[in-house]
């Protein structure tokens, strides 16, 4: 088996007809020797910010001297990004070897595992092989029935900002969504919650009490944002002052506050994470595709906000970092998202829209999306490819800013097309 064949195997597994649940993941991991039972975890769920928070936690724990696994989704450029140890992606040859181990176990199951369940098993195997001290484990979808929830006693469960997303799978209210996320709370295990949404907070508090799980809600009154530019945002939080965070979204200090709170909870459990390691980890964290500046002048931004809750935060960041500016927006949005609410947020900042379709069946066709946008009185044109869309957006932008956003699924293609446009 080579790398391409390994990728084909992983992606060939179909979701259709599978009932949600943990039984397949448990069966698969048992056939592989239960590698997850050798590991310790920080488990991270939430609607928005969970990937950024997970990356910050991993960076800080690594700075403290631990060998740290990081499991995230989706990927931006290459699949291997999803499974990392100490900031290094799983090498191709090791990924192939693990797929060769997982495939016979998966194929022998009467109820064949889903793609994400296979990826979860690959991650657990790799982290166990690398003898990670701790793994920062990002939930794929929801919490209760997510395949990552096979873990039994995390060092800490973290619930980041909650909002309306994946309502078909999780339920139509914030209370339903909170209940799904709160499914990662285990008996006696500490919980850190972003909080701030009364309907959701009530659910998380109730579940934590039922599980006898000590709950810490992040105190954002202790967060002071001192300023931000196109290189870093500077903040103070609860005695840790003057942190220069290279993730420049205005919302990122709040994610950092969640990470800091979590690391202090871990410290209380005996993990040796000094304040100096927290500072170093935050100031060196890398997390591509989240309000990422690919070029300063004229500005070209790449952002993965893919629901109204995330878009609201991105729009505020655009206003903060580029006051008074109008943008050429290069957009692709999944057809199952609240497209109109997202467009209503973007329209006041728009000079022009260029629409494309990300390479996934869920993406709204470019012309359909352009028609939605024109209904708001904004000029929009559809491009036949992401490459053509990037070129056209840059042409229309001129000396002004361009922002590509709407889904993480086109981030890698946009990055490649931008590099091709600007090389030489």
Identify the role of each PLM range.
Residues 1-48, 52-67, 76-78, 131, ...:
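N-terminal leader/targeting and accessory segments in enzymes
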Residues 18, 22, 26-37, 63-152, ...:
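ATP-dependent carboxylate-amine ligase catalytic core
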Residues 37-38, 134-137, 145-158, 162-163, ...:
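Nucleotide phosphate-binding/pyrophosphate-handling subdomain across enzymes
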Residues 57-62, 127, 266, 346, ...:
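Hydrophobic alpha-helical packing residues
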Residues 110, 118, 131-138, 154-239, ...:
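Acidic, Mg2+-coordinating active-site environments of NTP-dependent enzymes
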Residues 127-133, 269, 320-325, 393-401:
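Glycine-rich phosphate-binding loop signature in dinucleotide/nucleotide-binding domains
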Residues 194-216, 230-234, 299-302, 308, ...:
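C-terminal helical cap/extension that packs against the catalytic core
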Residues 407:
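Active-site-proximal loop/hinge segments that shape catalytic or ion-binding/gating pockets
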């Amino acid at each position: 088996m080579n790398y391409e064949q390994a990728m084909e195997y992983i992606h060939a597994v179909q979701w259709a007809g599978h009932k949600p649940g943990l039984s397949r993941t448990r069966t698969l991991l048992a056939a592989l020797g239960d590698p997850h039972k050798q590991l310790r975890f920080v488990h991270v769920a939430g609607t928005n910010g969970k990937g950024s928070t997970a990356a910050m936690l991993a960076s800080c724990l690594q700075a403290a001297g631990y060998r740290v696994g990081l499991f995230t989704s989706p990927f931006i450029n290459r699949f291997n990004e999803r499974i990392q140890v100490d900031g290094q992606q799983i090498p191709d040859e090791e990924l192939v070897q693990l797929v060769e181990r997982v495939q016979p176990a998966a194929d022998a199951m009467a109820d064949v595992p889903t793609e994400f369940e296979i990826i979860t098993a690959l991650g657990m195997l790799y982290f166990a092989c690398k003898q990670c001290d701790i793994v920062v484990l990002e939930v794929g979808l929801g919490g209760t029935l997510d395949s990552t929830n096979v873990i039994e006693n995390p060092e800490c469960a973290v619930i980041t900002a909650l909002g309306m997303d994946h309502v078909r799978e999780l339920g139509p209210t914030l209370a339903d969504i909170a209940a799904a996320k709160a499914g990662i709370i285990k008996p006696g295990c500490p919980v850190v919650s972003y909080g701030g949404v009364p309907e959701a907070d009530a659910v998380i508090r109730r579940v934590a009490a039922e599980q006898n799980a000590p709950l810490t809600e992040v105190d954002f009154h202790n967060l002071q944002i001192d300023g931000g530019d196109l290189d870093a945002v500077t903040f103070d939080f609860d005695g840790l002052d003057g942190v220069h965070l290279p993730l420049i979204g205005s919302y990122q200090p709040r994610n950092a506050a969640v990470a800091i709170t979590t690391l202090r909870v871990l410290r209380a459990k005996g993990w040796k994470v000094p304040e100096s390691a927290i500072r170093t980890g935050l100031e060196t964290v890398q997390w591509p595709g989240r309000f990422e500046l690919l070029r300063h002048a004229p500005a070209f931004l790449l952002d993965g906000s893919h629901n109204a809750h995330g878009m609201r935060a991105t729009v505020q960041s655009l206003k903060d970092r580029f006051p008074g500016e109008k943008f050429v927006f290069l957009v692709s949005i999944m057809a199952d998202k609240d497209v109109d609410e997202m467009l209503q947020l973007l329209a006041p900042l728009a000079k022009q829209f260029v629409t494309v379709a990300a390479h996934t069946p869920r993406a709204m066709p470019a012309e359909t999306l352009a028609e939605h946008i024109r209904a708001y009185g904004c000029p929009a044109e559809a491009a036949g490819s992401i490459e053509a869309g990037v070129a056209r957006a840059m042409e229309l932008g001129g000396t002004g800013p361009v922002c590509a956003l709407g889904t993480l699924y086109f981030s890698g293609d946009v990055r490649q097309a931008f590099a091709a446009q600007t090389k030489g």
